[in-house]
Swiss-Prot record:
This is UDP-N-acetylmuramoylalanine--D-glutamate ligase. Belongs to the MurCDEF family. Its main location: cytoplasm. InterPro entries: Mur-like_cat_sf, Mur_ligase_C, Mur_ligase_C_dom_sf, Mur_ligase_cen, MurD.
C-alpha cells in the first residue's frame, strides 16, 4: 500500500488511531486526526473535513457504519478502513524470513482474549517472537496492531479481532483463523444478527493453513462450511464432546485430535493431553470451566495448524493462567456452616459469556450481579436457561429495564434487588452489600453482568477491580474471624 503523499483522515484518536497516525506520518502521509474529545486533534468536527482532498479514512470502532461521516466518505468513493486493514496492507517483511510474519486471527462473541493469550504463550515457548495484538492491546502504543505489523522482528502476530474491526476490513488472508462462537452482541452497532455474523466470518476468507471453528455452534459451523479458503487449508472443528473426523475434542478424559492437525490422518485418533493436566484452569473444587476448555482446544488447533512443535506447545499450555476478571475468585468469607465465595467475571459483557459463567456453578448457588449497558440485547433466554442456578439477582447499571423484564417474565420467583444507578462511585459497594443479604454457606456471589461497563465504570477491568475491593471489604466486616 502506497501512502506517501496521500491524505488520511483518522477518525478517533484512541490508542489504535494515534498509533496508526504515527506509523503513517513516518511514511510520508498527510494525516488529519479528528476527535471532538482530544485537544491535540487536528480537527474536532467532521464538518470541518475537506473531503475533496481525502484519499482514505481510518474509522475507530466507536463509529458504526451508519455514522454520517462514514456515509459521506463512501458516497464520495473514499475507502473507509479499519486499523486492521491498514496494518495488514502496511506490514513489512520479517528480518529473518524475508516475508511478512504470519497472522493468526481469533474472533467470536466470547473467548477471544484467553484464546489469543494461550496462542501467543505456546508460540513464544516454541522460540518465536509472537506478541498479542489487535483488540487485546493495552494502552501501550508500541504493541498496537499497526506497530506490530510494521516491526520486522516479530515472527508471528496473534491478533484478537472484534466484529467492529472486521467490518471495515476486507483484504485479510490469515495463515490461521478461529471463530470461537457467535451469539447476539453489538447488534445495535451492526444493524442485525446476520450483519454481525458476516463481519465475524471475514477471518475465514482466503485463510491459508487452518481455520478453527466451534463445531457445537450451528452458525459458526455454517460459516466454516461456506468459507472460501486457500487450497490446502485445513478446517478443524472443536467440540467438548468426543470428536468426529475433522474435529478436535474430549474423549475419555483426553484431548483427542481427529482432524489431522496434530499429525495423524484425518479420522485417526491422536491423544494429545489428559484433561487432568489443566487443573490450573479449574475452580477450587477441581472441576474445569467448560468455556476455558473450549479456549484450550481452539488455541491448540491454531498453533498446530501453523506447524508449531506439539510437545513444546502442550507444555506451555498446561502452565497457562488466564488474565484477570475472567471467572476469578477474588474473596472468600467464612460464615456459619461454611463460606461464601466472590467470583469476578467482569469480562462477561454479554449474555453468551454470562451463560458460560453461570452454568459453571451448582443449582441455586449463585447470587448474580447483572446489568449495565445492554447494547440492545434481551435476556429472557439467558434468565430462563439459568434460573435453576440463580438463587437471587442484584441488578446494576443505567440500562436496567431489559434485565428487570427478563426476570419478571421468566423467573418471577427469584428475588431481585435493583441498585439505584445515580451514584457510580458507590454502586458496587451497594451491590455487594445487597448480595450479602442473600448469601449463606456454599453460595457464590458472581459478578458476570452480561452487559458492557461503560455506563458506570471506566472499563470492565475497573468494574472488576471495584467488585473485588467491595467483596474483600464485605468479607472482612461480615465474615467470621
Amino acid at each position: 500500500m502506497q501512502v506517501a503523499d496521500k491524505t488520511v483522515v483518522i477518525a478517533g484518536l484512541g490508542v489504535s488511531g494515534t498509533s496508526l497516525a504515527e506509523v503513517l506520518r513516518e511514511r510520508g502521509t498527510h494525516v488529519i486526526g479528528v476527535d471532538e474529545r482530544k485537544p491535540e486533534a487536528d480537527l474536532h468536527s467532521f464538518d470541518d473535513v475537506d473531503w475533496d482532498h481525502v484519499d482514505y479514512v481510518m474509522s475507530s470502532p466507536v463509529f458504526n457504519p451508519r455514522t454520517p461521516f462514514v456515509l459521506e466518505a463512501q458516497r464520495r468513493g473514499i475507502p473507509v478502513m479499519s486499523e486492521v486493514e491498514f496494518a495488514w496492507q502496511l506490514r513489512v517483511n520479517n528480518e529473518r524470513t524475508g516475508t511478512p510474519a504470519p497472522w493468526i486471527g481469533i474472533t467470536g462473541t466470547n473467548g477471544k482474549t484467553s484464546t489469543t493469550e494461550m496462542t501467543s504463550e505456546m508460540l513464544t515457548a516454541c522460540g518465536l517472537d509472537a506478541p498479542t495484538a489487535g483488540n487485546i492491546a493495552s494502552g501501550d502504543m508500541s504493541m498496537s496492531l499497526s506497530r506490530c505489523a510494521t516491526n520486522p522482528q516479530h515472527d508471528v502476530l496473534c491478533v484478537e479481532l472484534s466484529s467492529f474491526q472486521l467490518h471495515f476490513t476486507d483484504s485479510l488472508a490469515l495463515d490461521c483463523a478461529a471463530i470461537t462462537n457467535i451469539a447476539d452482541d453489538h447488534l445495535d452497532w451492526h444493524g442485525g444478527r446476520e450483519n454481525y455474523a458476516a463481519d465475524k466470518s471475514k477471518v475465514f476468507h482466503n485463510a491459508k493453513r487452518a481455520i478453527v471453528y466451534n463445531a457445537q455452534d450451528a452458525k459458526v459451523s455454517e460459516l466454516a462450511a461456506e468459507a472460501q479458503t486457500a487450497e490446502g487449508c485445513r478446517k478443524v472443528g472443536f467440540t467438548l464432546e468426543a470428536p468426529q473426523a475433522g474435529q478436535i475434542g474430549i474423549e475419555d478424559g483426553w484431548i483427542v485430535d481427529r482432524s489431522g492437525v496434530a499429525g495423524g490422518a484425518v479420522g485417526e485418533s491422536v491423544r494429545l493431553a489428559a484433561i487432568t493436566d489443566f487443573t490450573h484452569l479449574a475452580e477450587p473444587d477441581g472441576s474445569l470451566y467448560p468455556h476455558l476448555v473450549a479456549d484450550v482446544l481452539t488455541a491448540l488447533a491454531l498453533v498446530l495448524g501453523l506447524g508449531a512443535d506439539r510437545d513444546t506447545a502442550l507444555k506451555a499450555l498446561t502452565s497457562f493462567k488466564p488474565g484477570g476478571h475472567r471467572i476469578e475468585t477474588v474473596a472468600e468469607a467464612a460464615v456459619e456452616g461454611g463460606s461464601v465465595r466472590f467470583v469476578d467475571d467482569s469480562k462477561a459483557t454479554n449474555g453468551h459469556a454470562a451463560r458460560a459463567s453461570l452454568s459453571s456453578f451448582p443449582a441455586k448457588s449463585v447470587i448474580w450481579i447483572a446489568g449495565g449497558l445492554a447494547k440492545g440485547s434481551r435476556f429472557e433466554d439467558l434468565v430462563k436457561d439459568q434460573a435453576h442456578t440463580i438463587k437471587a439477582a442484584v441488578i446494576i447499571g443505567k440500562d436496567q429495564q431489559p434485565m428487570i423484564e427478563a426476570f419478571a417474565s421468566q423467573a418471577p420467583d427469584i428475588p431481585v434487588t435493583i441498585i439505584d444507578p445515580e451514584d457510580n462511585d458507590t454502586v458496587m459497594d451497594r451491590a455487594v452489600e445487597a448480595c450479602g443479604t442473600y448469601a449463606a454457606a456454599g453460595d457464590i456471589v458472581l459478578m458476570a453482568p452480561a452487559c458492557a461497563s461503560m455506563d458506570q465504570f471506566k472499563s470492565y477491568a475497573d468494574r472488576g477491580n471495584r467488585f473485588a475491593a467491595a467483596a474483600k471489604t464485605w468479607s472482612e466486616v461480615h465474615g467470621l474471624h
